Amino acid sequence: VLAYIAAQVCSVLKCDLILWFSDTGLEFPELKKHVKSFVEYLKRIYTGIHIELVIDYPKDKNGKRISFRDVILDVGYPIISKEVAQKVEFARSKPDGYCAEAFDPDSDYCKKYPKNCLKRWRGLLEAPFKISSKCCDIMKKKPAKAFEKMYCLKPILATMACESSLRRNDWLKNGCNAFDRGGRQRPISKPMSFWLEQDVLEFIHINNIPIATCYGDIVEKDGILTTTLYKRTGCMYCMFGVHRELQPNRFQILKDTHPAIWDYCMKPVEEGGLGLRDILEYIWVNSE
């Protein structure tokens, strides 16, 4: 949707449009295919502007491509939410810090900020595997910032405040266009921050915009627009928020739609897989 809107604006202003995509290896095969076909679709509609697709990859300091498996073995698994995963990681590294206090209901921190108390996830501190929120930073944000710096460009993102508490708080603090945040924070535009999922589906439906086949079709049920297959795609292996999903959850659906990928996800790390089965069992989530 954002690419479509940006192309409309660029068509009016007669300026070039650069669409940047990080091929992390976590995207659905249908989504990766759609990225290229959608750019060709935009070029057919907006013939008066130059539209360029840049496909990038997450790399280490030596230029070697980084995989999700590299990330989980190095820093840990992304589970529950970015906030919880980050606090678990910090609490483990500094047991006497405020992040550790967030898991103790009797601590001064939890008494002062009861809404921020994470006692429900206290058991994660003793989990027999690494936990981290750094996956998105490594796989998407770091290569994006490197691209921005190299070509002196500023990003326009399609993130929405309704997607997480962190994004909601960021929107409330900075608004849609945060060009003067100061410090080390880069200028950034998030014009869809106030959109809801229904707004996105309605915009696609009204403008007859093609979507990746993994979503299926957009249909109306009881006055609400929805997709017939996946509701969200994101990263196939990510476990953020899966504990809140009704069954069938994303991994149960993945087993039906992409069995080979599901097998790789669940296979133990020692056998070359990602070892997600044990992680999901630890947080009481069914994987099949």
Predicted feature locations:
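ATP-dependent adenylation/nucleotidyltransferase module used to activate substrates
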Residues: 1-199, 206
